[in-house]
Structures are given as C-alpha cells and as structure tokens.
C-alpha cells in the first residue's frame, strides 16, 4: 500500500456490473477510485497496432445465435486444442520466420552464420519478435566499444532497418493468417491496416499469439 497508488493499478473487469460494484465499494472503504477497463477493451488496446477495429462481443453472440456454423467456428477457437495448435505453430515459426544475411554498415560487419548463431544460441529465451533487437543491441554495443563512440540516432535507425529486414514479417496479422492457413481454418482478408476489422472470435487468439511472440 505504501508503494502503490491508484494511478499504478488497473482493474480488468469481466463486465459492467463488476465495474460498477468496484467504483462504488472502493470509496466506501476509504480508498481512491482505481482505473478500470473491461477485458475486451484491454484486448482491443493491445491489438490497436495490428488492426484498426475489433468486433463487439454482443455482435458476435448475435451471429452465433443465428448461424450454427459460425457458432461452431467460435467454439473451436475457444478450445484447448486451438491453444495447443498456436503453441505448436510458434515452435515451428523460428525456423521459417527468419531470412538471415550478412550485415555490413561502415566498419560493422557480421556474417550470416554469426548472426544465426547469436539469434538461436545467445538469446534463445527472448521472444521471437524481440530477439533480433537483442542481437542488434549486442552487435552495436560491440561496435561502439571498438570505435570509441556511440552511434547517433540516424545511424541506429539505419542499422535497425538492416536487422529488421531479416524477419520475413513482423506483422502479427500476417503471422496469425499463416497459422490459420497452416491449420486449415478460414483466413483473414489480406487488406491494409486501415481496413482490418477483427472478428471477436479472433481477438483473444491473436492476443495470445502476440504474447507468445513478444514480452508485452
């Protein structure tokens, strides 16, 4: 209590009834009101860099009631088997997501083999979509020590571009589509970010995939 304030805490509410209860009971206990949001709003915010909008849960429920085939598809995506398939997909992704190449920038040079070994053996515990950044930080630090100065922001951005190009894709929407296609599910439309509207049944699977590939 002495270390945390209301500004440091967010309560994830399963529904509006719970949210209303919390907002009423805390002041009665002499506590400050704590920021709260629904699970769905939290998920939507976490995916806002990937899709422009997400379907509301009520709309999905309405569609399920009217379309049994759609309801069955939703149930599959809520199953343990679906989660296990996502886990399996990510395990295999390491071998085909990367496209290593020799790195050359001024006096900074690393061979394809050196970068491959660093990626798989020096930083194996770092999530896949953050691992190349760790490799880059290591290589840049080594180079800065060698030349006796820090690279400027413009130089760092050029180097980062060279490293990030070694990913075949870092777009979570694209990677989730790879998964859907590989496991025989209906894929999402291949459209630009501005037109991406994520169905509710895909929100939490995509969020789970994000947390498998990134720390947050």
Outline where the language-model segments fall.
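Alpha-helical nucleic-acid-binding subdomain
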Residues: 2-216
């Amino acid at each position: 209590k002495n270390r945390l304030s209301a500004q440091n805490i967010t309560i994830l509410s399963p529904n509006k009834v719970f949210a209303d209860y919390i907002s009423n009971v805390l002041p009665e206990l002499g506590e400050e009101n704590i920021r709260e949001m629904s699970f769905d709003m939290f998920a939507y915010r976490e995916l806002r860099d990937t899709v422009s909008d997400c379907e509301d849960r009520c709309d999905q429920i309405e569609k399920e009631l009217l379309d049994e085939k759609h309801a069955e598809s939703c149930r599959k995506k809520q199953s343990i088997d679906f989660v296990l398939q996502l886990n399996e997909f990510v395990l295999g992704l390491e071998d085909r997501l990367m496209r290593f190449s020799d790195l050359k920038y001024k006096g900074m040079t690393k061979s394809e083999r050196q970068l491959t070994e660093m990626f798989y053996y020096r930083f194996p515990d770092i999530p896949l979509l953050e691992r190349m950044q760790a490799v880059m930080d290591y290589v840049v630090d080594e180079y800065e020590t060698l030349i006796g100065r820090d690279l400027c922001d413009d130089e760092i951005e050029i180097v980062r571009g060279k490293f990030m190009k070694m990913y075949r894709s870092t777009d979570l929407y694209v990677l989730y589509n790879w998964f859907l296609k590989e496991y025989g599910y209906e894929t999402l439309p291949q459209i630009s970010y501005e037109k991406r509207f994520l169905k509710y049944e895909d929100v939490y699977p995509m969020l789970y995939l994000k947390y498998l590939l990134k720390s947050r």
